[in-house]
């Protein structure tokens, strides 16, 4: 890597963004698992409310391009299928 100022700045920016993106992706995985566990435990009413929260988080991540919009749509669809069973 070059040692000029702009290359160093880009490196710092990339590191900050990577840390933030990993954090958001980890949070998404955690809340998806919580929603699935609620559904499997038979807590439908709680799961429906929590699904709205999960969908909102997925849409936000897709809008910020942390995950692809199709991935967000796929995850919401699969959670919804589980919820309606």
UniProtKB/Swiss-Prot annotation:
GO cellular component: cytosol; small ribosomal subunit
Gene3D superfamilies reported in the protein's UniProt record: Ribosomal protein S20
Any one GO biological process: translation
InterPro entries xref list: Ribosomal_bS20 (IPR002583), Ribosomal_bS20_sf (IPR036510)
GO MF annotation: an example: structural constituent of ribosome
Cysteine disulfide partners in this protein: none
Pfam families: Ribosomal_S20p
Function: Binds directly to 16S ribosomal RNA.
Name recorded for this polypeptide: Small ribosomal subunit protein bS20
Organism: Borreliella burgdorferi (strain ATCC 35210 / DSM 4680 / CIP 102532 / B31) (Borrelia burgdorferi)
Origin organism lineage: Bacteria, Pseudomonadati, Spirochaetota, Spirochaetia, Spirochaetales
